[in-house]
Every structure is written in structure tokens, then in C-alpha cells.
């Protein structure tokens, strides 16, 4: 069944879905299980995040240490690239408008209106958040910075993940430790993206299950077919 009916008035369907989510959350009494429910948001906090990360760290401590050090360098490189891209893009807007790359926030029902785009977004956002926030958390644990809570939040059609470090611990930590924690999230996302891209490029099986809009990014149809 085609999902193109969502393309028109997508924001209405998103709002309806949000109301349904709130009703289900209330019926399941999720407030008793770490959730905070408001008309515009659904937030989950867990105080046991660090204990789970500590168990992971016992098996991967050496690798995480290397990753944490790489994150410091990668963080500065990505920050430099972001400034370069921003300045170049602003310059293009005035000097070469055809080269200007429009940027927008991805919001289901607002900037994402097709059914396929919303579906891909909803499938990918949990992975991105888990990788990103998990990296922050495990490096903070490595640096012996206490994590008070970890969790996620949904603001109608916008999503967020978080690990909440103890502010005193974070402020008292060495500068290099703070840089490792800060750089870990974005670095983890970049590494994951490259690893996934490599997997797609080297395993033809994925061509069978990859969505059509993404297929052309990784594969070319052979001539004569």
C-alpha cells in the first residue's frame, strides 16, 4: 500500500500521531516508569545508565581510550570544517547564489512531508541518538565523571537524546577529559556513518534491501540492463 497520502497535510497526521502517543502513554501510566508527560513533550530519564556503561567499559576500555583521544582531534577538525563550510556557504549566497547550499532543520510534517522521508527519519533517529549519546556517556564514565541520568525526549515532532553529567564532576575534570567527552558524540556518528557506508559498498546484498532513493548513492545500474 502506498503511503503517499501522508504527503498532503503531513503536519496534521503528525499532530494526530502525537495525540495518540500521549493517550497511550497516559493509559500505560508511563509516569510510574521514569517518563514525564506534558502536552508538548514526552521525556524519559534513567538513573542506571552509568552502571550499564561501566559494564561495557570493562570489556572495551583500551579501545574506548583510543577513541576518546581521537575524538579530541576529530572534534577540532569538525569544528574547523563547520566554520569553513558556514563562511563559504554565506559567501556563495551573495557571490555565487547557484552554489549556495540551503540548510534546514529536519522536522517531520514541516520540512519532511513525504511518507518515505518521515519513515526513514523515524528509523534512523534512534540509531543516531544512541550512538551519539552513548559515546558521550561511555567516555564520561572512562574519565570518572558521574552521570546523573540518561534518556530521550520527544517534542511533538522533534527528538532529542541526552546524558546528564554531574556538573561539579564535569567542571572539576581535567580540560583534556572534558574535551574527550564533548568530542565523543559527533566522532562516534562520523565513524558509524563511514562504517555503514563501507558495509553498503562492499556487500551487494544490501542493494536488495536498500530503499530506492538511497540506492543511487551507493550503486550504479550496469550498462545494457
What label would you give each PLM region?
Residues 1-225:
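Hydrophobic transmembrane alpha-helices and their immediate loop junctions
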Amino acid at each position: 500500500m502506498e503511503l503517499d497520502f501522508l504527503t498532503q497535510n503531513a503536519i496534521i497526521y503528525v499532530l494526530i500521531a502525537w495525540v495518540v502517543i500521549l493517550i497511550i502513554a497516559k493509559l500505560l501510566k508511563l509516569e510510574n516508569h521514569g517518563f514525564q508527560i506534558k502536552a508538548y513533550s514526552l521525556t524519559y530519564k534513567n538513573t542506571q545508565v552509568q552502571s550499564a556503561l561501566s559494564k561495557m567499559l570493562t570489556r572495551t576500555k583500551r579501545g574506548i581510550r583510543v577513541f576518546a583521544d581521537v575524538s579530541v582531534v576529530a572534534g577540532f577538525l569538525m569544528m574547523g570544517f563547520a566554520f569553513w563550510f558556514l563562511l563559504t556557504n554565506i559567501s556563495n549566497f551573495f557571490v555565487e547564489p547557484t552554489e549556495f547550499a540551503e540548510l534546514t532543520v529536519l522536522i517531520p510534517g514541516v520540512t519532511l512531508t513525504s511518507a518515505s522521508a518521515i519513515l526513514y527519519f523515524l528509523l534512523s533517529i534512534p540509531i543516531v541518538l544512541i550512538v551519539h549519546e552513548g559515546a558521550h556517556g561511555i567516555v564520561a564514565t572512562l574519565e570518572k565523571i558521574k552521570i546523573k541520568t540518561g534518556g530521550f525526549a520527544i517534542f511533538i515532532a522533534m527528538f532529542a537524546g541526552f546524558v546528564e553529567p554531574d556538573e561539579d564532576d564535569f567542571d572539576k575534570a581535567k580540560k583534556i577529559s572534558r574535551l574527550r567527552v564533548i568530542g565523543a558524540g559527533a566522532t562516534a556518528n562520523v565513524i558509524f556513518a563511514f562504517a555503514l557506508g563501507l558495509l553498503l559498498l562492499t556487500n551487494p546484498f544490501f542493494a536488495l534491501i536498500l530503499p530506492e532513493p538511497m540506492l543511487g548513492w551507493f550503486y550504479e545500474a550496469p550498462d545494457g540492463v
